[in-house]
């Protein structure tokens, strides 16, 4: 696997009381730590535009603004985006 772009921006869109969001974050945390990557977590309900964009489709994980996965973690997709 190629090294991830140092400036890669990972954003996780979540909402309060979202079990899938909690599961995805728990799965993702050790992977991020092992790669020394930061995660920007945003509440979709805090912004009307973001709420309209994603609706009930949370959690949503993006890499540099590109959809990597939603609902469940797809590490292969995340790694492909980081390596591209």
For the regions a language model picked out, list residue spans one by one.
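Non-catalytic, surface beta->alpha helical segment in thiol-disulfide oxidoreductase systems
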Residues: 63-84
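Conserved helix-turn-beta segment immediately C-terminal to the redox Cys motif
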Residues: 25-43
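Thioredoxin-like thiol-disulfide oxidoreductase module
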Residues: 38-57, 62, 66
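Generic recognition of short, well-ordered alpha-helical segments
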Residues: 23-26, 53-56, 73
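Small/polar loops that bind or transfer phosphate-bearing groups
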Residues: 13, 42, 70
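Local sequence-structure signature of Cys/Sec-based thiol-disulfide redox active-site neighborhoods
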Residues: 2-31
